[in-house]
Amino acid sequence: MKIVISKPDKNKIRQKRHRRVRGKLSGTADRPRLNVFRSNTGIYAQVIDDVAGVTLASASTLDKEVSKGTKTEQAVVVGKLVAERAVAKGISEVVFDRGGYLYHGRVKALADAARENGLKF
């Protein structure tokens, strides 16, 4: 008899963690939410006003300014871009939503770059 132990799906666990955090976290017009999504090939960041349901600023590895480098280096550039675009629209304070990901690696690099370029969280 063969016993198979199924491994939990990492993305499903992340989504569950994200839903749990999102129940307590919301962005307003005064202090919007900086959301991060990480895929295998890229990283995406949006500044969202949850009350109006509007994206105020965004940046990703699909932008022309972000092309070369490692994934962590690209995350730094995305953090810089999203912060510059948010500050240009008069947004200085945000709520950081790590999307259920660990605050480490690419997510941390993006957050640090956003802080260095004028966003407070």
From Swiss-Prot:
It comes from the Bacteria. The keyword Ribosomal protein applies. The keyword Ribosomal protein applies. InterPro entries: Ribosomal_uL18_bac-type (IPR004389), Ribosomal_uL18_bac/euk (IPR005484). GO terms for cellular component: cytosolic large ribosomal subunit. NCBIfam families: L18_bact (TIGR00060). HAMAP family: Ribosomal_uL18_B. This is Large ribosomal subunit protein uL18. The lineage of its organism: Bacteria, Bacillati, Bacillota, Bacilli, Lactobacillales.
